């Protein structure tokens, strides 16, 4: 199995300006992500960025970079531009790794690629089991349901499935026992499917939930879902997240 890893790295960030370039123990954050991705077994790792400063930094540490438009409204549109510019074949497996995940386990990057390769689907992703009530009711934590065949039924910021007789006053034990799932934002696709995906218009569901993957379900595509082999640490969205990542890495 051959797969390509693409890491989108946007320069602009509301809460953390120049986020991919923020220092973590002497290296820019995007380099930490790239180094993790290189360990996953893909034959190619490409960093897709909309800014020349990021491109220059990536080139200096030895990474492959694709300079993309700064007009994209979604990460998948950026992937589509990379697939086109780099002449990636339609049957190539593409794994999208977020550029703000400096602690992402390499094993789950390989896992999601293998899952796509082993199933007759165009898209695959991962989840982990929820253990805390607060996470279940946190709209920033995306929940997901799957069917008996491991195909995603729905993604939501709401607490799903809704336990009529137990919500909202349920315990952490209740959450654990009922195997609620938190979605992890890592995806594998066929390159040709990415081109198809960006031709579809945004749907009402994805706009309501602000969850781009719902466009695929709305259009009848199946998304394979599996439990991640390793639970990833938090991504970097805030200054507090950044400090936590610095602390974790300094203790390794």
Curated annotation (Swiss-Prot):
**Location of this chain's protein in the cell:** Cytoplasm
For the keyword Cytoplasm, the answer is: yes
Is Cell membrane set as a keyword in this record?
no
- Which cysteines pair up through disulfides? They are none
Q: Which segments of the protein form a coiled coil according to its record?
A: none
The protein's GO terms of the molecular function aspect are:
3-deoxy-manno-octulosonate cytidylyltransferase activity
Catalytic activity entry: 3-deoxy-alpha-D-manno-oct-2-ulosonate + CTP = CMP-3-deoxy-beta-D-manno-octulosonate + diphosphate
* SUPFAM superfamilies in alphabetical order: Nucleotide-diphospho-sugar transferases (SSF53448)
Q: Name one Pfam family in it.
A: CTP_transf_3
For this UniProt record, the keywords arranged alphabetically read as follows:
Cytoplasm, Lipopolysaccharide biosynthesis, Nucleotidyltransferase, Transferase
Enzyme Commission number(s) from the entry:
2.7.7.38
Tell me a GO biological process for this protein. Answer: lipopolysaccharide biosynthetic process
Q: In which pathway does it act?
A: Nucleotide-sugar biosynthesis; CMP-3-deoxy-D-manno-octulosonate biosynthesis; CMP-3-deoxy-D-manno-octulosonate from 3-deoxy-D-manno-octulosonate and CTP: step 1/1; Bacterial outer membrane biogenesis; lipopolysaccharide biosynthesis
Q: Main EC class of this protein? A: transferase
Reported function:
Activates KDO (a required 8-carbon sugar) for incorporation into bacterial lipopolysaccharide in Gram-negative bacteria.
Family membership, please give it.
Belongs to the KdsB family.
Name of this chain's protein: 3-deoxy-manno-octulosonate cytidylyltransferase 2
Q: Which organism is it from?
A: Actinobacillus pleuropneumoniae serotype 5b (strain L20)
């Amino acid at each position: 199995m051959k797969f390509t890893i693409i890491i989108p790295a946007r320069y602009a960030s509301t809460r953390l300006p120049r986020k991919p370039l923020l220092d973590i123990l002497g290296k820019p954050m995007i380099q930490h992500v790239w180094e993790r991705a290189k360990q996953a077994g893909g034959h190619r790792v490409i960093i897709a960025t909309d800014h020349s400063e990021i491109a220059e930094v990536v080139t200096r540490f030895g990474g492959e970079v694709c300079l993309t438009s700064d007009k994209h409204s979604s990460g998948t549109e950026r992937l589509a531009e990379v697939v086109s510019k780099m002449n990636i074949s339609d049957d190539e497996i593409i794994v999208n790794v977020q550029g703000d995940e400096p602690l992402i386990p390499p094993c789950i990057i390989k896992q999601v690629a293998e899952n796509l390769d082993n199933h007759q689907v165009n898209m695959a992703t991962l989840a982990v089991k929820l253990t805390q009530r607060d996470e279940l009711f946190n709209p920033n934590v995306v929940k997901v349901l799957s069917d008996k065949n491991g195909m995603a039924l729905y993604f939501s910021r709401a607490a799903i499935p809704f336990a009529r007789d137990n919500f909202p006053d349920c315990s952490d034990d209740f959450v654990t026992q009922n195997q609620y799932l938190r979605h992890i934002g890592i995806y594998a696709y066929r390159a040709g499917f990415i081109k198809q995906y960006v031709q579809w218009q945004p749907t009402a569901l994805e706009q309501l939930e602000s969850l781009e993957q719902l466009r695929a379900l709305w259009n009848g595509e199946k998304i394979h879902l599996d439990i991640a082999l390793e639970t990833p640490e938090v991504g970097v969205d805030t200054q507090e997240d950044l400090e936590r990542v610095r602390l974790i890495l300094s203790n390794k």
